[in-house]
Amino acid sequence: DHIYIDMAWRKQYVGVFELEYNGCKFYFIDNEFYFNGDKPYDFIHLDCEKFIFFSKAVLSILPTIDFRPDVINCNDWQTGPIPVFLDTFQDNPFYQGIKTVMTIHNLKFQGRWDFNKIKDAMGISDYYFTSDKLEFYKDANLLKGGMVYANKVSTVSSTYANEITTEEYGEGLHNLLRARQN
């Protein structure tokens, strides 16, 4: 199966491969432009766009493969755009009710990039690019966006969860993390 999605000024191919192993289905997103190579982090300036593409592709392919998850667990900045995109997809009944969890493994890496580059790559409304959403000290922050829009925020341990709510370890996001504590 495949579809095409809008990425900035062009359409990008989204292929999906399915593998069933021990009764569990795995899906793999395919795209030669973004994923042709032997390293997941290849070209630093393309990484943000690559993971924005991946996040949008994950959600966009779901109706095609007829898979509607109850919860999507997003890990670090690389999948931070998923909860943001999911919010933009809410006019489509297929996506209504899907929940997200944003899991933080290392707060040091936030997917912080040039504001205009992210805005262009994501192709979403200005509404999402304010200081209470994706904007972060005049840049755009993909992890912050995921944290704002996810239904829940989790970390790798309760100790880490407490540490990152402090100014010392919160990497500038401690107030948001305090507000999202459950």
Predicted segments, located by residue:
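Catalytic cores of nucleotide-sugar-dependent glycosyltransferases that transfer UDP/GDP/TDP-activated
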Residues: 1-182
